[in-house]
Swiss-Prot record:
Pfam families: Gelsolin, Sec23_BS, Sec23_helical, Sec23_trunk, zf-Sec23_Sec24. It is a peripheral membrane protein. GO terms for biological process: COPII-coated vesicle cargo loading; intracellular protein transport. The keyword Acetylation applies. InterPro entries: ADF-H/Gelsolin-like_dom_sf, Gelsolin-like_dom, Gelsolin-like_dom_sf, Sec23, Sec23/24_helical_dom, Sec23/24_helical_dom_sf, Sec23/24_trunk_dom, Sec23_24_beta_S. It is found in: Cytoplasmic vesicle, COPII-coated vesicle membrane; Endoplasmic reticulum membrane; Cytoplasm, Cytosol. One of its GO terms (cellular component) is cytosol. Disulfide bonds: none annotated. COPII is composed of at least five proteins: the Sec23/24 complex, the Sec13/31 complex and Sar1. Interacts with SEC23IP. Interacts with HTR4. Interacts with SEC16A. Interacts with SLC6A4. Interacts (as part of the Sec23/24 complex) with SEC22B; recruits SEC22B into COPII-coated vesicles and allows the transport of this cargo from the endoplasmic reticulum to the Golgi. Interacts (via Gelsolin-like repeat) with MIA2 and MIA3; specifically involved in the transport of large cargos like the collagen COL7A1. Interacts with DDHD1. Interacts with TMEM39A. The modification Phosphothreonine is found at T308. It comes from Pongo abelii (Sumatran orangutan). Its main location: membrane. This is Protein transport protein Sec23A. Belongs to the SEC23/SEC24 family. SEC23 subfamily.
Length: 765
């Protein structure tokens, strides 16, 4: 008999799904009392090297309002060649190609191990991938040079049939014609005036690519359609490499005390319009590189006077940021246009000051694009991260999907409340759509323009079965996720994941439901909800909501005597959940103090799209200790773990930090590691560096690497994350363990837990 932990892990590996509850309460009333909703973290393109895609199309239910895909949960009559849909119970005839099936000769989609299966659609033309580079030229020469080299490197990684385009901008916006031999030609637009797609079409003389009539069977490889601005790499590789090499800083003079005039808003608008006019509904990436904030035209985020700083959270709270609303509105309109036509927008922002990510965040957030933030294009952080965008799988294809749509089908006792993640609604109302919206709701279909193997959506459900309508003993609820997308090879693919979970009566089987709780998934699902609310609500209100939910969960599932906090017990399946909430409350996702609006937008962007493992690291960083007393070991994220004779390695997802304790730091300063008799000390210093390199080489985006020591200025990154169990207030308490006192007024986990128990057991609550 597998344990729940094994069951959860197997499901995640096979289907890319983690549910908050793995046994579902059988009535609406009981489900609302569970506090944490029935919800799932779903990774549509979860990598599964063991199951290659199958070269035929899925069999669909014949009922027009259902159209669910044949799956292992369907009942099959092999003699009559019929199958019953497990969602609407419609009886369907198998297509003629299934004539040879029997109990001993089953198609893959009926085998339980293929609860997730990927089909290749053989109809329709194979479209080329499109990459449109949008480059800011208002930056220092060495930054621009490094960026040009990175872009030239990326050209060498693109498939020869991929179409590429180039737009550069500063005070003006230039759309470069790439088909010209021996001459550079470009169309120049004013950076202060926005253009509609229609105006752009007329000015550039563009036409839409005709989509050829879909035909069955393999396609004869036709040359990819193109125009003067988007050309196949194989044709213009040398030309474009030379053109990038010749790119100069924006020639307009910048007076002293002024910022350069930068037209980011118009440049992105032209990029969106260009693709909209020529390649709607074809996989395309707009890759925008910016070295500072937009200072003119639509989408500007700050004026050109250097004495006026760019907005802070304080300015926004005091309604003293005059460009925020207008700028955000401009970029939201562009994001929605790009999402409608299925195009991805990436933003690579490298500058020492803010660049306007707060206003632009909707572009990557709604289109599934990447957001990368760094200090300079001339750092390994940017160069390595950008190179990883073009990572390839074992078949030599990019690990990116384009133009995805996710459709969810449910059995009749459960409905869909909504999704939180890098998606937009397709407004598809159906029988399985709930009235109660959470996140992007009111639909059972979403568009995800850009997908990677780790792109993860949070999907929230509502149990709608009435209290007085019992579900038959042994009944199961089913959910089907159907993801259609354009593979980087140009093929259309459909991935279908069908899962089922048992129902239980919460009045008689509450133990079964409690035992099925997945506290890690629940913590991330509640965190996404809290961060989603934080975008529109006041910070303290969100924290109060989070606390209230936690107290209610403790009251529902804790064991205690009324008004006796010391009697409170939480079972193992819930014991880590309060700790996750404690670290979430202190995290940069909900605490904006000490972060710029751009930094907050950047952190939230990544949390809203990463899978469970990475999201947990973001909430509760991992801490490893290295010492002479044994091999490296994970230790508590607590100030008591900071000891003089230890080296600590902390992984926060965004940073990898190595911290040397006081004694270790003194030995290192004295150079003991260079003496042959202290070789073991040299090995001790090297061990965390090797482990850090392993993480740095695999993560996207590449984390910031920090090497610090006791008393070092950057030790603050560690001190701000650990639980302050020792502070300046209690460091001299009798019997206090050794460790580093933290100078903070924040409450410790112990105080937080004591307070939580007191509130949970209170009869007044």
């Amino acid at each position: 008999m597998t344990t729940y932990l094994e069951f959860i892990q197997q499901n995640e590996e096979r289907d890319g799904v983690r549910f908050s509850w793995n046994v579902w309460p059988s009535s609406r009333l009981e489900a609302t009392r569970m506090v944490v909703p029935v919800a799932a973290l779903f990774t549509p393109l979860k990598e599964r090297p063991d199951s290659p895609p199958i070269q035929y199309e899925p069999v669909l239910c014949s009922r027009t309002t259902c159209r669910a895909v044949l799956n292992p949960l369907c009942q099959v009559d092999y003699r009559a060649k019929l199958w019953a849909c497990n969602f609407c119970y419609q009886r369907n005839q198998f297509p003629p190609s299934y004539a040879g099936i029997s109990e001993l000769n089953q198609p893959a989609e009926l085998l339980p191990q293929f609860s997730s299966i990927e089909y290749v659609v053989l109809r329709g033309p194979q479209m080329p991938l499109i990459f449109l580079y949008v480059v800011d030229t208002c930056m220092e020469d060495e930054d621009l040079q490094a960026l040009k080299e990175s872009m030239q490197m990326s050209l060498s990684l693109l498939p020869p049939t991929a179409l590429v385009g180039l737009i550069t901008f500063g005070r003006m916006v230039q759309v470069h014609e790439l088909g010209c031999e021996g001459i550079s030609k470009s169309y120049v637009f004013r950076g202060t005036k926005d253009l509609s797609a229609k105006q752009l079409q007329e000015m550039l003389g563009l036409s839409k690519v005709p989509v050829t009539q879909a035909t069955r069977g393999p396609q004869v490889q036709q040359p990819p359609p193109s125009n003067r601005f988007l050309q196949p790499v194989q044709k213009i590789d040398m030309n474009l490499t030379d053109l990038l090499g010749e790119l100069q800083r924006d020639p307009w003079p910048v007076p002293q005390g002024k910022r350069p005039l930068r037209s980011s808003g118009v440049a992105l608008s032209i990029a969106v319009g260009l693709l909209e006019c020529t390649f709607p509904n074809t996989g395309a990436r707009i890759m925008m590189f910016i070295g500072g904030p937009a200072t003119q035209g639509p989408g500007m985020v700050v004026g050109d006077e250097l004495k006026t700083p760019i907005r802070s959270w304080h300015d926004i709270d005091k309604d003293n940021a005059k460009y925020v609303k207008k700028g955000t509105k401009h970029f939201e309109a562009l994001a929605n246009r790009a999402a409608t036509t299925g195009h991805v927008i990436d933003i690579y922002a490298c500058a020492l000051d803010q660049t306007g990510l707060l206003e632009m965040k909707c572009c990557p957030n709604l289109t599934g694009g990447y957001m990368v933030m760094g200090d300079s294009f001339n750092t390994s952080l940017f160069k390595q991260t950008f190179q990883r965008v073009f990572t390839k799988d074992m078949h030599g294809q990019f690990k990116m999907g384009f133009g995805g749509t996710l459709e969810i089908k449910t059995s009749r006792e459960i409905k869909i409340s909504g999704a939180i993640g890098p998606c937009v609604s397709l407004n598809s109302k159906g029988p399985c759509v709930s009235e109660n919206e959470i996140g992007t709701g009111g639909t059972c279909q979403w568009k995800i323009c850009g997908l990677s193997p780790t792109t993860t959506l949070a999907i929230y459900f509502e149990v709608v079965n009435q209290h007085n309508a019992p579900i038959p003993q042994g009944g199961r609820g089913a959910i089907q996720f159907v993801t259609q997308y354009q593979h980087s090879s140009g093929q259309r693919r459909i991935r279908v994941t069908t899962i089922a979970r048992n129902w239980a009566d919460a009045q008689t089987q509450i133990q079964n439901i409690a035992a099925s709780f997945d506290q890690e998934a629940a913590a991330i699902l509640m965190a996404r909800l809290a961060i989603y609310r934080a975008e529109t609500e006041e910070g303290p209100d969100v924290l109060r909501w989070l606390d209230r939910q936690l107290i209610r969960l403790c009251q529902k599932f804790g064991e205690y005597h009324k008004d006796d906090p010391s009697s409170f017990r939480f079972s193992e399946t819930f014991s880590l959940y309060p700790q996750f909430m404690f670290h979430l409350r202190r995290s940069s996702f909900l605490q904006v103090f000490n972060n710029s609006p751009d930094e907050s937008s950047y952190y939230r962007h990544h949390f809203m799209r990463q899978d469970l493992t990475q999201s947990l690291i973001m909430i509760q960083p991992i801490l490893y200790a290295y010492s002479f007393s044994g091999p490296p070991e994970p230790v508590l994220l607590d100030s008591s773990s900071i000891l003089a004779d230890r080296i600590l390695l902390m992984d926060t997802f965004f940073q990898i930090l190595i911290y040397h304790g006081e004694t270790i730091a003194q030995w290192r300063k004295s150079g003991y590691q260079d003496m042959p008799e202290y070789e073991n000390f040299r090995h001790l210093l090297q061990a965390p560096v090797d482990d850090a390199q392993e993480i740095l080489h695999s993560r996207f985006p590449m984390p910031r690497y920090i090497d610090t020591e006791h008393g070092g200025s950057q030790a603050r990154f560690l001190l701000s994350k650990v639980n302050p169990s020792q502070t300046h207030n209690n460091m001299y308490a009798w019997g206090q363990e050794s460790g580093a006192p933290i100078l903070t007024d924040d409450v410790s986990l112990q105080v937080f837990m004591d307070h939580l128990k007191k509130l949970a057991v209170s009869s007044a609550a």
